Amino acid sequence: MNLIFLGPPGAGKGTQAKRVSEKYGIPQISTGDMLREAVAKGTELGKKAKEYMDKGELVPDEVVIGIVKERLQQPDCEKGFILDGFPRTLAQAEALDEMLKELNKKIDAVINVVVPEEEVVKRITYRRTCRNCGAVYHLIYAPPKEDNKCDKCGGELYQRDDDKEETVRERYRVYKQNTEPLIDYYRKKGILYDVDGTKDIEGVWKEIEAILEKIKS
C-alpha cells in the first residue's frame, strides 16, 4: 500500500501517518528526514542537497526526487510506504509519478486531512514551548498546571516565532496555494480521500482506517 498524506501545518497528519505505519508495517517517510539522512551518509545526491541547504535555499525537485527514489528502493518499502510532506507541488507530483513508473510502483491513495484556517491558527498559536527542556504545551488542549511554567522542569514557557499568528497564516496561505492544484490532480485520478481533520485524534484515525481497509480489500 503506497500512500501520500496531505494536510496543512497543524493538521496532525504526522501523528496519523505514524499510526498507519505501525498498524500496517510500512515506513513513514518524511522528506526532511530523508534529506538529512542523505546528507549525513554523504551520498552523491546528499552532497548536492547539502550545498543548497547550507545556503538556506530550497533543494531543487530533481535532487529531492532522486533522494526519494533511492529511499523507495530500500527493502523496508517492499510492502508499501507513506510519503509525509511530499509532494508539495504539482511539478513534484508529476515527477513522482514518472519515477514510480520506473520502479513499477504507483500511489494507491492520497489521504487529505482537511482543517480550516481558523482551526489551524487556534491549534498552533496556543502552543507554548519550554525554554529549558523543549516540552510542548497547548493552552487549550494540554495546558501546564501552573501558568507559564513547565510541569517537567519548572522552566519558562514561550511562543516560538513559528507559532505566531502571522507566520501561521502565511504558512497556511502558501500551503493552500501550492496544494490546491495537487488536490485536483489526485482527485481526477480517483485516489484522493478527504478526511475531517477537525475531529479528535481517535475520530480522524477511524476515518483513515476505514479508507485503508476498503483499499486493501
Curated annotation (Swiss-Prot):
Residue positions binding ATP: 10-15, 127, 136-137, 199
Keywords: ATP-binding, Cytoplasm, Kinase, Metal-binding, Nucleotide biosynthesis, Nucleotide-binding, Transferase, Zinc
Ribonucleoprotein among keywords: no
Keyword Metal-binding: yes
NCBIfam families: adk, PRK00279.1-1, PRK00279.1-2, PRK00279.1-3, PRK00279.2-4, PRK14527.1, PRK14532.1
Protein's name according to its UniProt entry: Adenylate kinase
Pathway membership, UniProt: Purine metabolism; AMP biosynthesis via salvage pathway; AMP from ADP: step 1/1
Annotated positions binding AMP: 31, 36, 57-59, 85-88, 92, 160, 171
Cellular localization per UniProt: Cytoplasm
